[in-house]
């Protein structure tokens, strides 16, 4: 029997490319969690049956056990020594189960994951999921190394299989554990400490990250240079001569002086002389070197500065171009091509695009030059176009990025730009002036990269010893100016220089400081720190500057590199780094008042923030509504904070009082045409009076997700109070046909009356011709749903003889059922004799038990967010 070879790629599109190349297009495909492509072929000299499938990035993520996920019940200090576990990144995708099923009965496993450290780490995740022992590496388990998804590269990789690198996989494990524990410990402490104290502190999570925070530190450092800058006046001489009827300005060798009187003295000396003597003429042949190969960091910098595309977006576009086979692997630190690289084939693939066809054909006909010797990081060749694309196929931004990659590659194999530089030196009154002219003799690579062209300017011809009359000598007055805010491109350069992040993670860190509201991206993609970002960095600086300096992260990256090279034990590195951060965390906690003083100076206390909105059920005084994230109410008298649902609007709801606690109800409205609106009691929402409600409703809350703060859980549509007219008991109509929830009458949806599910996004549109719709205390004898009363408009009533009032069950009453419409769900069938009732939130019971038991215990705060 022929052996079975399971091959696993990182993305479905790459799996398809691999299968197509190895099978010659003769394969069958069947559906699974990801597609499985099957074909017959040869493996290690024997006939074999191949199965090619894929994961979708990382299969497993590192996290804390459930016992450590409660923000209130866990001391952040304990996280440094807490165990970590690996759970499936996306349980709904069922990748783990898929790999285990496909691996059954397989003889060999070939790993086609991306060829970087993350890819090596995913290799071992895949091995764990398949159940094949790690001891089989080299016998049954192999690794394919490739830099593009072209047929040639795939065939070469298949013919030269290697082994996955355990050391590189362990290096990623070490970084993940360090970033998780350090980031979550600091984040939980400072978020809990500062949230709820200040009303205009606009942030749900005040996060810390070993990479994220030094990245922010660079932005704040530039901001501080700008705010502390003091302009200073300066003066310079502008000397002019007339040649062939043209006025020519000469540059003063002293550039500028900061003493006006001295500048005036030099002006008088030159003016009194009246003649400029040509003392030297220099003519040199200069060369502007072609660029080396393109690596990830340089691509991101150009995308931001020249194309206006942010690093995160640029990386996503580059990855898409790679998976579609248009470019080589986009995550590389190398700028040097291997000696065996086939430049002629790469150029020939681009010859038919009219934008650069002339340049390419010239290079192919007259000969191209090899790129400059760059840096060889030993990972992947520089980013290179692999096949021709069109703007229509890629879309605007992807095309612009692809176009630059093509132009850069063509530039690397083009000749250098050559030009003649002429410099003429003049003297007068003991002062020296000069003028410089450039004349391009060979455009070289700048013909394909015109933005790098040498500026040409012709200067008049003079001979040494010529005496030239001075036309005028002016004094120019100016002031020094502060530096501009850091651009994304400049920030990326600083991160690379200081060892912050990797070519793969740099875009994530830059994006995170924007997402966390620490900086804002202004015109020119310049990063302006917010008050929160500035105050955080100033706080770290006054407690422990190491927390926001790049030195620690640089040290960590160096240690992780040693692990990847097999020169350091990953457990010892993790233990050593965490011990250092434990000491810093302990000191930070003791000195947090220093940071708090800065927050107090920048932000307003809750008592001074917000507007009066609703009455407190405890003291009967009006509470203040704080609209900044996270939205909340604050009772000045009781000094209590009540968190509210986020990402919507809040207003008082008809001055209705909750019968359980005396608080005034609020109406929360989500955003969007089909979004829900629902009433809630602030106290019940934060402290659900019925057991299990907070778990039933997947609202955000501090002790589970760290997104909102304390508590959150029970709007009125989940309340089980038997007589309250806003509760699920009185407003619930029937079980949701899509999930285990209950359809609730939307109290403010008139005139477009509707029901919405209290668990999923299912919406049922009720008769629009109704003047009023309300629930009754009657039950349908057939299905036990609540009978509703509909008051139709007189002009549009469907009832006989102009009647307007009608009672019925929306499931069993033929008239009402014909007038309702289902949205965001499956078809809504009439029920006959099922007798399941409304379910009181349980809907169809055990038939959807698995969906109903979904948990919301994702704290995540994992390393990817820091």
UniProtKB/Swiss-Prot annotation:
The record marks 71, 188, 195, 331 as: Interaction with DNA. Residues 830-853 have a biased composition (Basic residues). Mg(2+) 1 binds at residues 10, 114. CDD domains: TOP1Ac, TOPRIM_TopoIA_TopoIII. Residues 830-866 are annotated as: Disordered. One of its GO terms (molecular function) is metal ion binding. Residues 854-866 have a biased composition (Basic and acidic residues). InterPro entries: Topo_IA, Topo_IA_2, Topo_IA_AS, Topo_IA_cen, Topo_IA_cen_sub1, Topo_IA_cen_sub2, Topo_IA_cen_sub3, Topo_IA_core_domain. One of its GO terms (cellular component) is nucleus. Its EC number is 5.6.2.1. Its cofactor is Mg(2+). One of its GO terms (biological process) is DNA recombination. Transmembrane segments: none annotated. It is an enzyme of class 5 (isomerase). Binds two Mg(2+) per subunit. The active site is at 329 (o-(5'-phospho-dna)-tyrosine intermediate). Residues 165-585 form the Topo IA-type catalytic domain. Residues 207-212 are annotated as: Interaction with DNA. It catalyses: ATP-independent breakage of single-stranded DNA, followed by passage and rejoining. Pfam families: Topoisom_bac, Toprim, Zn_ribbon_TOP3B. Keywords: DNA-binding, Isomerase, Magnesium, Metal-binding, Topoisomerase. Releases the supercoiling and torsional tension of DNA introduced during the DNA replication and transcription by transiently cleaving and rejoining one strand of the DNA duplex. Introduces a single-strand break via transesterification at a target site in duplex DNA. The scissile phosphodiester is attacked by the catalytic tyrosine of the enzyme, resulting in the formation of a DNA-(5'-phosphotyrosyl)-enzyme intermediate and the expulsion of a 3'-OH DNA strand. The free DNA strand than undergoes passage around the unbroken strand thus removing DNA supercoils. Belongs to the type IA topoisomerase family. This is DNA topoisomerase 3-beta. It comes from Oryza sativa subsp. japonica (Rice). The gene is TOP3B.
């Amino acid at each position: 029997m022929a052996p079975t070879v399971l091959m696993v790629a990182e993305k479905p599109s790459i799996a398809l490319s691999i299968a197509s190349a190895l099978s010659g297009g003769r394969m069958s495909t069947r559906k699974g969690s990801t597609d499985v492509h099957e074909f017959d072929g040869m493996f290690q000299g024997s006939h074999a049956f191949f199965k090619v499938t894929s994961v979708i990035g990382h299969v497993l993520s590192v996290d804390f056990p459930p016992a450590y996920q409660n923000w209130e019940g866990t001391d952040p200090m304990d996280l440094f020594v807490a165990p970590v576990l690996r759970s499936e990144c996306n349980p709904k995708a069922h990748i783990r189960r898929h790999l285990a099923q496909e691996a059954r009965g397989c003889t060999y496993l070939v790993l086609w994951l991306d060829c970087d450290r993350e890819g090596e780490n995913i290799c071992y995740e895949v091995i764990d999921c398949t159940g094949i022992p790690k001891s089989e590496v080299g016998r049954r388990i192999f690794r394919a190394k490739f830099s593009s998804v072209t047929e040639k590269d795939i065939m070469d990789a298949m013919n030269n299989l290697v082994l996955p690198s355990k050391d590189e996989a362990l290096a990623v494990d070490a970084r993940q554990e360090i970033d998780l524990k350090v980031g979550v410990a600091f984040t939980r402490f400072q978020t809990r400490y500062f949230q709820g104290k200040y009303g205009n502190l606009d942030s749900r999570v005040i996060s810390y990250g070993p990479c994220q925070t030094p990245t922010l530190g660079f932005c704040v450092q530039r901001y501080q240079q700008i705010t502390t800058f003091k302009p200073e006046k300066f003066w310079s001489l502008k000397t002019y001569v007339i040649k062939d009827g043209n006025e020519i300005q000469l540059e003063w060798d002293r550039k500028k002086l900061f003493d006006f009187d001295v500048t005036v003295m030099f002006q008088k000396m030159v003016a009194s002389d009246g003649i400029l003597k040509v003392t030297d003429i220099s003519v040199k042949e200069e060369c502007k070197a072609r660029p080396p190969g393109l690596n990830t960091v340089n691509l991101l910098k150009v995308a931001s500065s020249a194309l206006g595309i942010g690093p995160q977006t640029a990386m996503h576009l580059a990855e898409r171009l790679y998976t579609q086979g248009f470019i080589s692997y986009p995550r590389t630190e190398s700028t040097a091509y291997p000696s065996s690289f086939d430049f002629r084939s790469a150029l020939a693939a681009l010859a038919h695009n009219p934008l650069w066809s002339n340049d390419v054909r010239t290079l192919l006909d007259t000969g191209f030059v090899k790129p400059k010797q760059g840096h060889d990081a030993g990972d992947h060749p520089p980013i290179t176009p692999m096949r021709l694309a069109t703007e229509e196929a890629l879309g605007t931004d992807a095309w612009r990025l692809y176009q630059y990659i093509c132009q850069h590659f063509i530039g690397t194999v083009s000749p250098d730009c050559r030009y003649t530089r002429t410099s003429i030196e003049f003297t007068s009154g003991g002062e020296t002036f000069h003028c410089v002219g450039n004349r391009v003799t060979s455009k070289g690579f700048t013909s394909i990269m015109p933005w790098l062209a040498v500026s040409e300017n012709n200067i008049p011809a003079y001979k040494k010893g010529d005496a030239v009359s001075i036309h005028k000598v002016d004094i120019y007055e100016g002031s020094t100016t502060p530096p501009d805010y850091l651009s994304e491109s400049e920030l990326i350069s600083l991160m690379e220089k200081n060892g912050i992040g990797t070519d793969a993670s740099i875009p994530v860190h830059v994006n995170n400081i924007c997402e966390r509201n620490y900086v804002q991206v202004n015109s020119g993609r310049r990063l302006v720190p917010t008050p929160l970002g500035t105050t955080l960095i100033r706080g770290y600086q006054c407690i422990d500057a190491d927390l926001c300096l790049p030195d620690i992260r640089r040290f960590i990256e160096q240690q992780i590199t040693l692990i990847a090279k097999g020169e350091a034990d990953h457990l010892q590195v993790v233990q050593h780094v965490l011990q250092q951060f434990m000491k810093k965390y302990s000191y930070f906690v003791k000195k947090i008042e220093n940071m708090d003083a800065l927050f107090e100076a920048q932000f307003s206390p809750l008592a001074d923030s917000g507007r009066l909105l609703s009455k407190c059920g405890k003291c009967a005084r009006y509470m203040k509504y704080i609209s900044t994230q996270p939205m909340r109410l604050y009772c000045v008298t009781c000094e209590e904070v009540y968190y509210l649902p986020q990402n919507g609007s809040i207003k008082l709801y008809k001055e209705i009082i909750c019968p359980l606690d005396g608080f005034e109800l609020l109406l929360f409205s989500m955003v969007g045409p089909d979004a829900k609106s629902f009433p809630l009691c602030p106290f019940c929402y934060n402290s659900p009076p019925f057991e299990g409600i907070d778990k039933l409703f997947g609202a955000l809350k501090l002790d589970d997700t760290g997104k909102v703060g304390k508590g959150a859980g029970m709007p009125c549509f989940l309340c089980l109070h038997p007589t309250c007219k806003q509760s699920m008991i009185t407003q619930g109509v029937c079980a949701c046909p899509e999930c285990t929830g209950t359809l609730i009458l939307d109290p403010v949806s008139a005139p477009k009356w509707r029901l919405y599910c209290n668990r999923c996004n299912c919406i049922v549109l009720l008769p629009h011709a109704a003047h009023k719709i309300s629930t009754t205390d009657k039950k349908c004898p057939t299905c036990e749903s609540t009978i509703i009363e509909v008051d139709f408009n007189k002009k549009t009533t469907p009832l006989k003889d102009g009647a307007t009032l009608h009672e019925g069950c929306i499931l069993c009453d033929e008239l009402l059922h014909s007038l309702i419409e289902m949205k965001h769900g499956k078809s809504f069938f009439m029920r006959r004799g099922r007798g399941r009732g409304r379910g009181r939130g349980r809907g169809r019971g055990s038939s959807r038990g698995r969906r109903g038991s979904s948990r919301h215990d994702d704290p995540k705060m994992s390393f990817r967010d820091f």
